[in-house]
Amino acid sequence: MNQKIYFDNGSTSWPKAPQVASSMSELLESGAFNINRGNYEGAYELESLVLLTRMQLARLFHAPDSRHVIFTPGITYSLNYLIKGLLRPGDHVLVSSLEHNAVMRPLCQLASQDIHYTMIPAETDGTTQPESVEALIRPETKAVIMLHASNVCGTILPIREIGDICRRHHLFFAVDTAQSAGSVDIDMQECNIDFLAFTGHKGLLGPQGIGGFLISEALDHELTPLIAGGTGSQSDSLLMPDYLPDKYESGTINLPGIIGLHAALTYLEEAGIPAIHQKKMELTGYFLKRIQEIPQAHIAGKQTIQDRLAVVSLDFPEYDNAEIAFSLEQDYGIMTRV
């Protein structure tokens, strides 16, 4: 079929926001300079765009200081930075039972270093009760790490209430916003978030290969930088700068990715995230209603749009899901993920 319908936005959004591709192409063709190194106008202009992108992200997540916006190659890198830069032998963390491998695999790697985790139980639809968190806190618990919304069933977790619990117990609170950023409002200060990890290529409608994290001042004092190298600042010293964002951004950052993300964020600011989210949920509600007319289909998670995002997973227990996905593309041009 010539017409294609893309249903894999939970993995990577497409199409991208307008001007993302053209802004990246223009940079690469007309002046792919570096920042913090060159003493010429093009480098200064590019540095201003990077600063503007930090400010856009600080506004998006209600962070008080754009210097606390750190760019990384993606959210997996960001979460590894947190887990491996914060935890020490004897530490314990709480994680949701819905976590992505970007959290679980690093934690499993650290098990041999006497670093342990406990999973917070969830109901069959992904619902997580805040009181379940409080009951699992130990004297050696250092942080709570959880996604904001499941990448499988779309269920939204109560991060505001859990953030309050973390504050009362003096725990660091880290939130993975891979699925929720660009869809719902996330207030880093109101939710008491110390570490907010984001990626550009999903709900933010930007390119792959660019992500990052926002960090609180309290956590910044505890987090160990994992990478050392050139920053374009204090180059006469063999010691890493101890100020943000340079402290966590060694090497050449992904400038084409940042410029593409800037274009995407500009689009989101103009279109309005609430309006975009409303449209997504209208379509999701219609999809859920119609899919329930198919008796062989099982919906993972919540059956309505209440407390969920536009991420829907289906199971057909009587059939091979891979064969269904193959048929959907070959016969109907519908691209899905199994």
Region spans (language model):
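Pyridoxal 5′-phosphate
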Residues: 1-338
